[in-house]
Every structure is written in structure tokens, then in C-alpha cells.
Amino acid sequence: KAKLAEAGGFKGDKITLSYNADAAHKEWTEATCNSIKQTLGVECVATGVVDFATFRTEIGERKMKGLFRTGWQMDYPSIENFLSPIFATGSSSNDGDYSNAKFDTLLDEAAAETDAAASNAKYQEAEALLAADMPSIPMWYGKTTMGWSEKVPGVKITAFGTIDFSSVSMK
């Protein structure tokens, strides 16, 4: 509450946290709103949007008011695939309209690098800027739970959280 007051307080009568109602988001968004109410003393309402397509349209057309949930599944295993599409100025998935010239420059420099270690170092610098600016609030990350037996050795999980069936064998 002290930090909120220091930042100028909350302007408005309530916070709205929107989610697509055609998936399992109601429970955690309501829990998040309850936490906001209890911690900050600010009214918060979790509001479902009928389906994902409508939800994404409202976000894309900048009709969404207040907070909204989002998520990202990497297309390929690289830090770049989390930074550029979501946070680069003008990127199609930059739903929060984040813009930082230094961040964009670091992304460009990282992409131009021919050395993977140097490229990753630039991406990590850009990531540090995101941590300082905090344009979105990471709530959690997904995880995959798998099980197997001694009769099925060598099971490997891909970077996408699925079984690499080429690694599976039977004893």
C-alpha cells in the first residue's frame, strides 16, 4: 500500500482483469483480483470475454481496458523469440505497446551478431531493461509433468515440453 501511495495511488474506482472465458482462467484471475483487493485495498473485478478470438480481437484493436491476461509459447528455443515478438516497438504481439529505443537497439545488435555467445549477451542486456521497466507482470510459467518406468529408458522432453518419441525405447 505504501508503494502504491508513493506512486500516486490508484486513479479510478476499480481494476478490471480480463480473460478469455473459453479456457480455465476464471479461477486464477479471481484469485489475483482477491489478492489485489486484500493487499492494496483496491476493488478488482475479473471479467471474462466470450472466447479467445473475441479476446484477441479486442486486444489487437486496443479496445481492452485495464489489465488482461496473455501468454506465449516459443516458436523456437531462443531468448530472441520471447523478447522481439512481445516487446520490440511495433511488433505484432506487443499487446502492451511497450517501447524503449535502447531495448530495440539491443535487439537489433543481438540479431546482427554472428557469434551466439555475443548475441545472447545482447539479448540478456535487453532482458535486464525489461526487468527494470516491467512492462508486463510475469505470474508463472508452464511446466510439464511426465512419468515413465525402468522399462522405458531414455525418455527425453523437448524444449516445448513434449516427449521426444525418437528417444524412447523399450527394455
Residue ranges and their predicted role:
Residues A112, A118-Y141:
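Ligand-binding clefts/hinges and TM-proximal coupling segments of bilobed small-molecule sensing domains
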Residues K1-N34, Q38, E125, S169:
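Append "and occasionally in soluble cytosolic enzymes with long acidic Gly/Pro-rich linkers
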Residues A21-H25, F52-A53, Q73-P77, A128-L129, ...:
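Solvent-exposed loop/turn segments at secondary-structure junctions
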Residues D22-E30, V49-A53, D97-A101, E113-N120:
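Soluble non-cytosolic domains of exported or imported proteins
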Residues T57-K63, S84-A112, Y141-K171:
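Short, solvent-exposed loop/beta-turn-alpha elements that line the ligand-binding surface or hinge
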